[in-house]
Amino acid sequence: MKKIKILLDTMGYENTLEHVIKAAKDFYYQHEDDLEIILVGNEQLIKPLLDNDWRLFPIVHTEVSIEQNDTILSARKKQNSSMHLALRYLKDKQANGMLTAGNSAVFVYNAYATIGLLEHIKKPAFMPFVPTIDGGVTNLLDVGASIDLDGRDLFNFAIMANTIAKMRTPNPRVGVLNIGTEDHKGLPYHQEANELLKTSNLNYVGFVEPKTILEREVDVLVADGFSGNIALKTMEGVGKTISNFLKNEYKKPKNLFAALLSKPIFKKMKKAFDYKEHAGAFVLGLDGILVKTHGSADYQQFMSALKILYETIKADVLNEIKKDLNNYYGQ
């Protein structure tokens, strides 16, 4: 059986190395029959954490790291960084996919420069999975990789995200993020995307307002990187604010009884919206499977991101995306 090979960038994030190495070990043992995880980073730091398992994990050694405060310009001076090395390995087809928790802007830029775009694609997109109230997810893209987009870009994003959504849902519903649901609403690129999607064979439902994102009105929601990023961060901020408010209120003696009664409900709500279960965001539009997780990722988030990457590679999603794009563009 041909093994799936995953490159795991172990450097440049805010948490300790123990989290990523433990996740690598545990995930490997869940799929050891068809999986190889290549660790990219400082071998002297990695090996002691692997203990007796070090022979099971190829290591690409480097002591150079792209830090969270690096800029695209400063990162160019670090060509031997773990991120650069992993991307070059992926470009050379020495692995099937890559996971990093490193600097987002630098990662997208270097992935674009190293891997290159798919045919028909002009811009890359970040696509996280947004947890919804019914326990499902909405594929939201773009959330910051590309700002200056046109309707054709949004159309292409919808095609690619739809391919991934089909892993979970047979006939994904697709929408465009807008300030209203009426056809006349939005900017010219909204109108262009709307017309293109209406004439496609995607299950297009039209414009979607931000207020319904968490209700999973659609399975795929496309936006420009500016609007998508604001929507995502607003949801994250509101969730954090509500959580902090409730914690402070329930600490008050007069609310103790109410806190005890409502604890199961809020525990259920927390689980439904727990982003740690969906902690990987795809960089779509590039000729490779690339997943980015949070810069402060812990063990659980690395496990979640590895699962997303592994399942996507196993389903041959990159080739499915290429086929779907070629079908739309007549090749």
Swiss-Prot record:
UniProt xrefs under SUPFAM superfamilies: Isocitrate/Isopropylmalate dehydrogenase-like
Function: Catalyzes the reversible formation of acyl-phosphate (acyl-PO(4)) from acyl-[acyl-carrier-protein] (acyl-ACP). This enzyme utilizes acyl-ACP as fatty acyl donor, but not acyl-CoA.
Protein name per Swiss-Prot or TrEMBL: Phosphate acyltransferase
Record pathway: Lipid metabolism; phospholipid metabolism
GO terms under cellular component: cytoplasm
Disulfide bonds: none
Entry EC number(s): 2.3.1.274
Gene field: plsX
Similarity field: Belongs to the PlsX family.
GO molecular function, one term: phosphate:acyl-[acyl carrier protein] acyltransferase activity
